[in-house]
Regions:
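Short loop/turn segments that connect beta-strands within beta-propeller blades
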Residues: 2-6, 47-48, 100-103, 151-155, ...
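PDZ/PDZ-like peptide-tail recognition elements
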Residues: 426-468, 472
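Conserved PDZ fold ligand-binding element
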Residues: 473-496, 501, 512
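A short helix->beta-strand "capping" segment at the edge of beta-propeller domains
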Residues: 4-10, 59-66, 258-276
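Blade-terminus and WD-like Trp-Asp/Gly-His loop motifs, strongest in beta-propeller folds
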Residues: 20-29, 76-85, 123-132, 170-178, ...
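A short beta-strand motif characteristic of beta-propeller blades
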Residues: 8-12, 63-68, 106-113, 156-161, ...
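A flexible loop/linker signature enriched in serine peptidases of the S9 family
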Residues: 1, 12-18, 28-55, 67-74, ...
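Terminal targeting/pro-maturation regions of precursor/exported proteins
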Residues: 190, 349-352, 356-421, 425-426, ...
Length: 513
């Protein structure tokens, strides 16, 4: 959808899950993963017509499978900064890269530093495309992860944090001169698998960036003036001709190579937040002056701001959201905020919030969705169950036995019960199915009648009037043995699900005859 208008384009329409969507640098290609056919695969969606500028207004979108396979799982794609390569996670543990022109694949990590089979881990390309920062587990210290650095060509991972506690969510900031991450090393730790309090921290790639960042506001301003004067003396001052660079020239500009100095890097780690808290995501402004972060001090998440030179922190926007994530555009002009019930854009200059609206219709094949979810549960247990023998259960045979009930289920309450009984065959804790209906959806009225399903004639033969239901009153003519033939004048046929005639009829006058 557009960030400025409610124009929205549907990219996929399948019962299977799609996840990990990302834009190419030119914004004309989307990469994502889908579990169609029972296996996570990478897909590319491209704007077909050159004259169409963006996805929300595109009329034709072409989709292709990248590296098709029925056995190898590929997920969580990310385009390289130049758009020529795509990184992804293979079989839930290995970081890989594919050249989009040649389709040649190379291995960056071998999977030995990740143990969870949940699906993937945090990673990010460096701005120059030569490095990855990633979340990994060193010294077999699962599940406590560190932040690592590895060449985009593959090789040994350098542990940047070496902490006994969990560090996560690494991202490149300050033009690639530092990595921002969150850690529980100072806060309440998850000794019992919950309750972590986190801080935002920086690890600097080189001494020069570290020294500049630690300058006071006054010293930093003096440093900028000095550098400006030095450029003027050296004759490097930008003249009018250079200011008139064309858009094409700017487009071809390559990012500077990042200077990585591993020696002494453990001494270039700084804690940014003044106190540990229940944090969401964090972002540093393009100029490196401000830290924005989500934190839940009073029940839910709000947006906080910290001046990194003055060391001043304040509540910027009261969001009151149950979960929160944010991302800055590549120009550093806008911050996009996602919450549990809203999307918003914040202008980085004025720090004003603007809601992002969308207009979209969604059609769902609910039976196909339930079949996909059933298959997803089957595969999750098959790949992730802690006991290779599946507690002695023939999982394929058990799956076939429960699959036969799927065609007879027409609601998610019953589907949740099916999943609970199906998973219960494994005799293990923390499994089962739940369904929480959305109260904002269409409401189907209930007549408070039970029917004789052996009735073969027209309409529905009433077997019982439910006590205290709509027809259980003194003047009601409806009783057991009555045949209900029409609802609001529409005839009930033998092959019809009559409940659709009651859609959105709750608390409304309805004629039953």
């Amino acid at each position: 959808t557009s960030a400025d208008y409610n124009t929205t384009k549907q990219i996929t329409h399948t019962p299977a899950a799609e996840t990990g969507v990302c834009f190419s640098p030119d914004n004309r290609t989307l990469a994502y993963a889908s579990e169609r056919g029972g296996n996570w695969q990478l897909y590319l969606a491209k704007i077909a017509r050159k004259e169409e500028a963006n996805f929300p207004n595109a009329t034709i979108i072409e989709e292709e499978v990248l590296l098709p396979s029925k056995t190898v799982e590929r997920n969580y794609p990310q385009f390289s900064p130049d758009g020529k390569e795509l990184a992804f996670i293979e079989d839930r543990m290995r970081l890989m890269v594919v050249n989009l022109e040649t389709k040649k694949v190379r291995q960056v990590t071998d999977g030995s530093t990740w143990y969870s089979t949940a699906g993937g881990f945090d990673y990010s390309w460096s701005p120059d495309g030569k490095w990855f920062t990633l979340r990994f587990i060193g010294n077999k210290h699962d599940p406590y992860s560190d932040i690592g650095l590895v060449s985009a060509q593959g090789g040994e991972i350098t542990n940047l944090t070496n902490s006994g506690y969990t560090s996560t969510s690494p991202q490149w900031v300050l033009d690639g001169n530092a990595i921002l991450f969150t850690t529980e090393r100072y806060g309440m730790r998850a000794h019992a698998s919950w309750g972590s309090l986190n801080d935002a921290m920086l690890v600097f790639m080189n001494q020069d960036a570290y020294d500049k960042f630690r300058l006071s506001k006054e010293d930093y301003e003096l440093q900028k003036e000095l550098e400006k004067e030095q450029k003027e003396v050296a004759g490097d001052k930008t003249d009018d001709k250079k200011k008139e660079d064309t858009a094409d020239q700017k487009k071809d500009e390559k990012p500077k190579d990042i200077v990585v100095e591993l020696k002494g890097i453990q001494d270039r780690i700084l804690r940014l937040t003044p106190n540990s808290s229940e944090m969401g995501s964090a972002v540093i402004s393009k100029n490196g002056e401000t830290l924005y972060y989500f934190s839940a001090f009073e029940d839910k998440y709000d947006l906080w701001k910290m001046d990194l030179r003055k060391k001043e922190t304040k509540l910027l926007h009261k969001m009151n959201t149950g979960w929160a994530n944010m991302e800055m555009d590549k120009e550093g002009k806008n911050l996009f905020l996602l919450g549990s019930n809203s999307m918003q854009k914040m202008d980085m200059g004025s720090e004003k919030l603007t809601p992002i609206h969308y207009q979209a219709n969604l059609k769902m094949d609910l039976a196909a969705e339930r079949e996909y979810m059933f298959d997803h549960v089957y595969k999750q247990e098959q790949k992730r169950f802690y006991n290779v023998n599946m507690h002695g259960v023939n999982w394929d045979a058990m799956t076939a036995a429960y699959r036969k009930f799927l065609p007879h289920i027409n609601n998610n309450y019953d589907f949740a019960e099916l999943l609970s009984e199906y998973l219960g065959e494994l005799n293990v804790s923390h499994t089962g199915g739940r369904f929480r209906p959305q109260t904002s959806g269409n409401i189907t009225a209930n007549l408070g009648l039970l029917f004789d399903w052996n009735h073969s004639g027209k309409g529905l033969l009433i077997a019982e009037v439910v006590e205290k239901g709509p027809f259980d009153h003194a003047r009601s003519k409806v009783k057991a043995g009555t045949v209900m033939e029409k609802i609001d004048g529409q005839e009930i046929t033998p092959d019809m699900d009559y409940s659709k005639l009651l859609n959105n009829k709750a608390q409304k006058k309805t004629l039953v005859s």
